[in-house]
Amino acid sequence: MLVLISDLHLGDGTTGSSIPTSAFQLFAKRLRLDAHFASAQGERYRPIEELDVILLGDILEVLHSNRWLYAVGDETRARMTRPGESDYIRPWSDPTDPKYAAKLLEVTRAILEANKDSFEIMRKLASGEAIEFDAPDEHGNRDRNSDKKIPLKVRFHYMVGNHDWYYYLKGGSFDVIRREIIQALGLSNLPEPFPFDLRKMDKNFPWEEDSAPAIRKLFEEYRVFARHGDLHDKFNFNRERGRGYPTLGDLLGVEVINKYPEVLKTMPGIDPLFAQNPSESADVRPGFAAPLYVKAQLH
């Protein structure tokens, strides 16, 4: 059984609210029901042995965190960093700068903490604690009275999109971050760069296909193919260089959508409630419609 999910945008709470834990509880319930339904097709009862969930990008909302506006470790958020300053770091900065991985780790840990109850549900699904089947009897029928249960471990596979492409970056410092994500979400990924594209749409594209053999095997087995849709968005994907590079969308997200509410908070005479409302513009899709949302708030 294969399930694909994308665009959960689970953030650290600094620019908007994430979907509640109750949504994950409902997801686990639906997944359990579907697994049981798939195990009892026709007159035969055969508990399924595999259930894979592909997280198809923009699962963790890394881009829309106002932590990018401040120095690494600055929890006071009293002063935004500026270009040219020694503590300045943004998604489009040089990823080999030690501050880059440090800031990404800071943002990632904040996201994992803010959504820890939701991720606990994922871990229980992955460990086999959330879905189990009645064992079949000697005739292959479902034995509802049997004390023996067959647990099903859900395998979660992470692929990146344009709001979490930072987990595609190579290097030991980024492997450390990915390990924390794997542990927190119960992923089946290795700590190497999370994949983006397993089949180039155009052979002339300059980047290489990602390997990800486990995901590739699923695509072949189920005769499907999937990638995040940013490949078709020129503002959020660089077709000349590939997924491991920043785009105009990163700049808009940090310096406009994230920054505007933070600037309002520092202006005298601004109602704190009004200053908070524009932070929800991070949830506006597409991102370029955010100014329309802000204009509506002004009225």
Q: What are the language-model segments listed below?
A:
Residues M1-H299:
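Extended recognition/assembly regions associated with phosphoester-bond processing machinery
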